Each structure stands twice: as C-alpha cells, then as structure tokens.
C-alpha cells in the first residue's frame, strides 16, 4: 500500500468514528430506506447494447497529485452537462480532506439529473456504505489495495443487500485475482501506479486476458484523448471512468462528446 493510501485510510477511520457520534447507524438506515435506487449496472449495459461507450463521468474538484482541477465547480451544472452529452453514470468525490469533495456535491449532482451515481470515496467501514445509500448513492467503490479480500466480500454483501452496485478497483494482477472472488460484475482497472502516480492504459490492456467474459471492465485514470479511447475500444474495453480530462475542459459534457461520440 502506498504512503498516501495509508494516510487516507487512517483519516477515513477517524471520520467514521466522528460520524457515528453525530449520525448513529440506525438513524442512517432509516434515511437510506427512503431513498430510490437507479440501476447503475443497467445504465452501463444499455450503452453497450446500443453499441456505444459507457462513460462514468466524474465530478471532481481536486486531487492530491494535481491540486485543483476546476475553479468554476458547480456539481449540478456539471451533472446536467454530462447527461446532455451522453454519460451513462456519474462518479462524485465525497472525500473532503484529500479531494475537496463533499456529500453535498453528490446530492446536488444526483438531484440535477436522472443518471445513477457512484459515491467515489475510500470505503473502509460498513457505516460508510449505509451512509452512501442515505445520501442517495446508487453504487460504491471498493479499492482492493485498501482492503483484505474478506473485508471486500463483507462490504460487498452489505452494499448489495441495500441495493447498491459495487465497483471494485484494482491496480495489479494480484488485486485482480482477489477482486474476482467478489460477485460484482464491475472490475475497475486503475491505470495509475500507486507508487509513482504515473498513468498508462497499458495497465488495463495487460490484465484483459485474465478477466472472465461475464465481467464489465471499467478502465480508470489516464484516459486523456480520443486516441486512448479508440485504442481501448479496439481491445473490447467499452466502459470508462473519466474525471481529469473533463474537469479541465471549459464544458465537461462537450469534452465527453468530443472524446467518445
């Protein structure tokens, strides 16, 4: 595990302890039960059926490695732009300390469109999954580098019991093998090296042979051009999670359409 990931996980555990005091779990469960769910996996498959790329478009203000990506940051406006220009789903950063995200950003983005929404955060505790459902998320992220296999299995079971889709994220072959023990069809391959922070789409390409046909490969990070998209689609990768390239553009949705459609 990288030093930055170690630090983030330590902060997350502290955040959970504090949140449990201000919003007890049973209170969150009640709130979660009143929320509707949008079909995250179904939205991706609908794009595939239509012969289109399925793009999970990210609402992300900043990152630890790049700093602020977008000064004019209005989540509702960004969400509407993505929906208008063909996004399948949204991914919204809710981590405050490292990515300048917010639960409010997820709520605002989801309210502004009809797309399913992934809570993009560092999940280390069951509390965060119930919390995700309560805030209106339709899917959660599990990062293999941050969790033991048994933890991922338990967290996935809880998420599925609440109606949430699960995207499991891997960085290398060992993590991929662990992720394939889960039930989720969504296998995210992060092209960013956790030690150097460099990105290469070769990471995704190098793992494809090991992934069963019934899984949906989601390529993440480092997809910056139409050429990257065309190369990956030629390798039968049709699901993409993209943030930085869109966030740096004047009009995120227009950049989405330019790169993918």
From Swiss-Prot:
Tagged with keyword Lyase: yes
- Biochemical pathway: Amino-acid biosynthesis; L-tryptophan biosynthesis; L-tryptophan from chorismate: step 4/5
Pfam family of this protein, just one?
IGPS
CDD domains registered for this protein in UniProt: IGPS
Q: Which reaction does it catalyse?
A: 1-(2-carboxyphenylamino)-1-deoxy-D-ribulose 5-phosphate + H(+) = (1S,2R)-1-C-(indol-3-yl)glycerol 3-phosphate + CO2 + H2O
Q: Name one GO biological process term.
A: L-tryptophan biosynthetic process
Instruction: Name the UniProt key words of this record, in alphabetical order.
Output: Amino-acid biosynthesis, Aromatic amino acid biosynthesis, Decarboxylase, Lyase, Tryptophan biosynthesis
What Enzyme Commission number does this protein have?
4.1.1.48
Q: Looking at its record, which EC class is this enzyme?
A: lyase
The answer to keyword GTP-binding applying to this record is no
PROSITE patterns from the xrefs?
Answer: IGPS
Q: Recall the GO molecular function terms of this protein's record.
A: indole-3-glycerol-phosphate synthase activity; phosphoribosylanthranilate isomerase activity
* InterPro entries reported in the protein's UniProt record: Aldolase_TIM, Indole-3-glycerol_P_synth, Indole-3-glycerol_P_synth_dom, Indole-3-GlycerolPSynthase_CS, RibuloseP-bd_barrel
* Tree of life domain: Bacteria
State the family named in the UniProt similarity comment for this chain.
Belongs to the TrpC family.
- What name is this protein filed under? Indole-3-glycerol phosphate synthase
